Amino acid sequence: ARTPRISFYNCLKNSAQQFYFRPKEEDAYLLAGYPWFKVRARDLFISMPGCTLSIEDPVRFEKIMHTAIPAIRSFMQTGKADEEIREIENPDVFLWDIWAMQQHSRKMGVEKSKELYFNFIGEIITYFREQKHPDMKLMENGLLFVEGRNKALTWMNSTVDGKPVVSRSGYIVEFNA
């Protein structure tokens, strides 16, 4: 049933729900925007807590995460991008995924989140510690380093002729904050 638009909160709830996307019954995603964007990994994880947990829909959060985790695992194992979740190969996607799981923990409690996501977070950490990501490296000083001179790897991903408008390389502050 549609949420009645009788309050500001209900209007926000309605707006959030308009981005839910289920191409198959067993899948759950968030669209990055209408009509031009599809499902983009960075946007998915950044917006997931606000579009689910803040409107008291933890089940939707868990369904979306249940869809996203196999896609990320597949990328970590094969290096191949997902068909539905675009830009899953971007290095900060993994960091935003962990951030989203932290928001789940804040809302639903550490024990519940630990039960659902602890092992997967460990897989991501191992992936970086073993230097498996093609575009980001964990350096000896404990910071994450990217080489983005010829490839847009951050949220500042505008390109002209396939090259970044703002090339960002090194210890990107938002990756290491």
Predicted feature residues:
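The feature captures the catalytic groove of carbohydrate-active enzymes
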Residues: 75-96, 102-119, 126-177
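Beta-strand segments within the central parallel beta-sheet cores of soluble alpha/beta enzyme folds
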Residues: 62-66, 115-122
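Substrate-binding groove/exosite segments of carbohydrate-active enzymes
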Residues: 2-102, 171-173
